[in-house]
A protein has these predicted regions:
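PRPP-associated nucleotide enzymes
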Residues: 1-363
Length: 363
């Protein structure tokens, strides 16, 4: 990540229960924001939230951010690009309606992986229904992990506009996503400006944090590289950190979001995945170093000094009183986890999850 060590999280606004931060110090071409709100925190900390509620949990924060962007004159006429089916979890149309932002058109794209000899050979657009709104703001909601789908679809859309002699003013992305998104969008901006020099760039809004993806199977041996999100190497909203560490288990989940599509539409698959994860951890608990697992989830080896902790979390511009409280809370959390074994934690989660979502479990 270019200049990542120099990046700091800077408070932008705190209104209507939504806290917003922007990234500074990275010398980026684009704007990057992190927003935090009670419902989106609940979504990412509670895999028991499924179905329509997954969508509903993002409405308030999305609306408030669009209000801010409208006030900043960053968005006028919107053209929503719905990348199927991940986009269906993001309430962009509803949020625009609430904030009196005119949605001119909604375009649809679907891309699928192409396999050759059981290996991914690339991506192919399977369905396309594009509408062109010259000089508009393109809006996208998508999970960005590896970012391959996003790159593929954005190139397809910009080519479509160019073929019709039109251009886009800017692109706004709402995402539950990772650090790779920043690298990708910085490169894409340079690419787009070669043919649209006036392109204003991307405004990317991350819910609750800019996470990172595992690059291996992790300490537990169950994680999927370039798929599963965790805190390490990312930037987490202070409010999300506070809430996550006020509860016993959320930080130990396999992924911060799991499979967004399954969580919304194939709920039984999501239930099976979460139960399989915790059953696997329960079976292998005695082979997993609990301290090492906790350090991995927090993002650094502990103990860590307050000064190093602030730097590791990019919190230099967070109010010192708030940062110190968060640091003390984390120390308390680490201490409290010494009183529970990983097996006990796994059994507790299996029980909680089964009780909450029993109606979705297929025998």
């Amino acid at each position: 990540m270019k200049n990542w060590d120099n990046v700091v999280l800077v408070p932008e606004f705190d209104e209507q229960g939504v806290a917003c931060y922007r990234l500074e110090g990275g010398d980026y071409e684009n704007e990057y924001y992190v927003i935090s709100e009670a419902e989106s925190r609940k979504l990412l900390n509670t895999p028991e939230i499924v179905g329509y509620e997954v969508y509903n949990c993002l409405v308030s924060s999305t609306s408030q951010m669009l209000y801010y962007l409208k006030e900043q004159k960053k968005v006028t006429t919107a053209n929503i690009l719905s990348i199927l089916r991940g986009a269906l979890n993001y309430p962009l149309e509803e949020a625009c309606y609430r904030e009196h932002i005119r949605v001119h058109d909604i375009s649809f794209l679907s891309s699928e992986r192409v396999f050759e000899e059981e290996e991914i050979a690339g991506l192919e657009i399977k369905y396309s229904k594009l509408t062109m709104v010259p000089d508009s703001t393109l809006m996208i909601g998508d999970i960005i992990a590896s970012g391959e789908t996003l790159i593929h679809c954005l190139r397809y859309v910009t080519d479509f506009y160019r073929d019709h002699g039109a251009r886009l003013r800017n692109i706004i992305i709402f995402t539950i996503g990772g650090t790779k998104g920043i690298d990708i969008l910085e490169k894409l901006t340079a690419e787009i400006r070669q043919f649209w020099p006036e392109f204003e760039g991307f405004i990317t809004v991350y819910y609750e944090g800019i996470f990172s993806t595992y690059q291996d199977k992790g300490v537990s041996g169950i994680n999927l590289p370039d798929v599963d999100f965790y805190w390490k190497g990312g930037i987490v909203a202070p409010e999300f950190r506070r809430e996550t560490l006020s509860m016993c288990s959320p930080i130990f989940e396999k992924c911060i979001i799991y499979d967004g599509g399954a969580r919304r539409y194939e709920i039984h698959e999501h239930v099976e995945e979460v139960l399989e994860v915790w059953k696997g951890i329960s079976e292998r608990a005695d082979k997993i170093d609990f301290k090492e697992l906790l350090d991995e989830k927090l993002g650094y080896p502990t103990p860590i000094s307050y000064e190093d902790w602030v730097k590791a979390n990019h919190y230099q511009d967070i109010r010192p009183a708030d940062a110190k409280w968060l640091y003390r809370q984390e120390l308390g959390y680490i201490e409290s986890m010494k009183d529970i074994t990983l097996k006990e934690l796994a059994e507790q989660r299996i029980g909680e999850f089964t009780d909450a979502l029993r109606k979705y479990i297929l025998d």
